[in-house]
Amino acid sequence: DVDFIGLCLVLLLFGLFWNAIIAQLDTLTLEYLTTEHHRYSSIRVWGSIGFIVMMLGSGWLFSDVDYAVLPWLIIIGLLVSAMISFGLPARPETHLASADHTGIGDRLRHLPVLLFFAVAAVNQLTHGPLNVFFTLYVQAHGYTAFEAGQLWALGVFAEVVLFFVLPQFIRSMDLRVLLTVSLVLGSLRWILIGAYPDLPWLVIGLQLLHAFTFGAIHSVSIEFIRRWFPGKLSGRGMALYSGFVFGLGGSLGAMFSGLLWESFGGSLTFILSGLMTGIAAMIAWFGLKKANLGVQSS
């Protein structure tokens, strides 16, 4: 038997420290890249590749091995990551180069900053039904567990492709346009998954949109943080992004999707997520005109 309270505490502690690590890792990545910050997605892509490898590998491993070994495998992986981190070269000093001496509070008084965090959090919130219930949802509509796993892999594969391609044009486009288009595609993705889950070819195509609903939006978000929270503000800006978007947005998405799923069923839950994402797209387009997301030469 699993101690529910004990499991919740373990996950709480893990989430507390893991989110802190992710925020600082993104900050360090941008500092290492210095003027080549547009290459962020070329590094972030390896996390997605690792996800695919572990997902496929775990499916093979746990067909013969008990799940009790999973925590030990996770611990080993984290220890290896920690040891590798000690081998990283000293990062370049970039804080002194920043001429912007405003504090974190000054940044948070700007309406575009608040709107951007709200849009990004809503986008993460509307991923709740996917993250929590997608496997159960497609299985309830006749897909096998293996097919559900392949749909997950397909979505992350599309994300990998976008991460490889994005650095080539991210500096030459208006990121507000990319953000808005990605949110519109997200709205279509959730609504159509909710309305037509029995069409395999459509579900496959919609999974490819994960490249935009996560990959593109995350890349735009990282660039937004870089522009609005430069120098010594970068770590706190990234921590705010991670905590507010993935922490608050992700947890509320999981909670509300569970409540809606129980009350209205899976299809309507996805459709409501799509409508919320559509509202977020309109806020992004009309509310972020002064969000400093235009084309930059460096």
Regions found by a protein language model. Give the residues of each.
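Helix-loop junctions at membrane interfaces in 12-TM secondary transporters
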Residues: 1-11, 194-206
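Cytoplasmic helix-loop-helix junction between adjacent transmembrane helices
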Residues: 12-46
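Loop-to-transmembrane helix entry/capping segments in MFS-fold secondary transporters
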Residues: 34-46, 145-146, 229-242
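Helix-to-loop junctions at the C-terminal end of transmembrane segments
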Residues: 62-63, 161-175, 261-262
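Symmetry-related core transmembrane helices of the 12-TM Major Facilitator Superfamily/SLC fold
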Residues: 69-87, 268-287
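Juxtamembrane intracellular "pre-TM" segments in multi-pass secondary transporters
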Residues: 88-122
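Helix-loop boundary and gating motifs at the non-cytosolic
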Residues: 112-153, 218
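Structural signature of the two symmetry-related core transmembrane helices
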Residues: 177-192
